[in-house]
Every structure is written in C-alpha cells, then in structure tokens.
Amino acid sequence: HQRGMAVILDWVANHTAWDNPWMKYPSWYTRVNGEVIHPEGTNWQDVADLNFDNKDMRKAMISAMKYWLLAANADGFRCDAADMVPYDFWKQAIDSINALSGRNIILLAEGGRSDHFNAGFQLNYGWDFYGKLKSVWNGQAAGGLYATHRQEQLSTQTGKTRLRFTTNHDESAWDATPMTLFNGQKGALAASSITVFMGGVPLIYGSQEVGRIPALPFFSNAPIDWTANPDMLEAYQEMMAIYTSSP
C-alpha cells in the first residue's frame, strides 16, 4: 500500500487441502458413498471438493473472506477456478463483502462465465482472446483476433472488463512461456502490446517481463534471473507507463 499498489489475495473457494481444519466437518465436503472426494472431472488428487449445498460452510467461507478484508486490509480477491463455484454462492458472498462500509473491493474471477459479472465481479479472464492470439501466431488470419475482441467486449457489462494476458500461472506451467509461444523476444513483446493496448486490463505474470524461456513449474522451486534481458523489462515498463497514463 505504501507503494501505491493494491494487494489482492488468491481465493480458492472450490476446494481445500486434505489437512485443512475444515476436514473435521465432513458434511462441508462433497462425498460419494460417505467418502470425501477430489473435484469431479479433474485429476486434482491433492485437494478436497467443497459442498456448496452446506449453509454452514458458506457462512464460514464468507466470514473468512471478510477477515482478510478487515483484519489484514486486503483490497480484494482473485477467485481461483471461479467457474466451478455456483453462481448463487458468488452472489451471496459478494453482496456480503460489498456491504462493508468504506471499501472499494477488487474482484477478479478466474473464469469465463458471463454470470460472474451479474454476481458482482468486475473482471473475468479473457480466455477466448488469449486462444485467438496464439492462433494468429500459428498462422491464422489476424482479423479473427479483432472479432474475438469485439465478442468479448459485447458480452461484458458496462463498467466491467476482461483480463488480457499472454501467460498466467497455469499457461506458464502447462503450456509454454511467451518467449516460446510467440517466437522470441520480439514476438513476446508484440503479443503483449496487443493485450495492453487493445482493451481490457493487462496481466503481467512474474518472469515474462525478463523473457524467461523455461516453464515455471507448480510444485518445485524455479529461481528467476531478474537481471536477464533488461531491454525487454524496459519495453514492458514503457508499455505500462503509456497504459496507466492513457486510461
């Protein structure tokens, strides 16, 4: 905050670790034949799926969100796997935290459902735009990128917007970094300039600004050389200076 930055927490509402204290309340979790399960349709064996039919779990979740806003003075949440959580919970939770007086809360949904905006999120991930951007670099007509941009904008409510990116924590781990996806430094910068200046809110994922080539794994340490490619870092700084001064 002293640096003029907002701080938002990554909020994982859909599931918890298997050693979470909530595990003492089995009814708070999705169960099959009496056994708590991991999220259906995934291979996420390291987490347990929460049961949003349980009113006590919902109440505890909302209370925890309020704690981080009030006690820790967080500015909002980036809500992980938002598409996996029911609309009515997001509406209930967001209505509750927005009722806190004197707070301007930032709410980002890691998802693509349009009803996230109805629930109260200001930002949705621009997944379609990202997919089309990669397609253009793989040889498809660039005109399709503008059509995708327009479609995303038309499906976004007034006063709300999409997060635009050339990578994020999932893509950098499971797909590739921008240096690989967009054919080197010039391509990575060109793709990023599109996400910055074509509309929406740009996401800069740590290490892309110094042109890291290897993927960033989820479950192991991956030191980043922050001194690499200073000219690339300078280009990102220039882009963001223009973006922030020309809303």
Regions found by a protein language model. Name each.
Residues A74, G200-V201:
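A structural motif
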Residues G41-F52, N168-P178, S220:
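Short glycine/proline-rich turn/loop motifs
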Residues H1-A72, Q92-G102:
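Substrate-binding/active-site clefts of carbohydrate-active enzymes
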Residues T16, N20-P21, P86, H116, ...:
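Conserved protein kinase catalytic core
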Residues G4-V7, L107, P202:
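Hydrophobic beta-strand scaffold residues
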Residues S63-K66, L70, D75, D80-F165, ...:
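Active-site-proximal helices and loops of the catalytic beta/alpha 8
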Residues I204-V210:
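Short acidic/histidine-rich active-site segments
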Residues A188-A190:
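Conserved interdomain hinge at the start of the Helicase C-terminal
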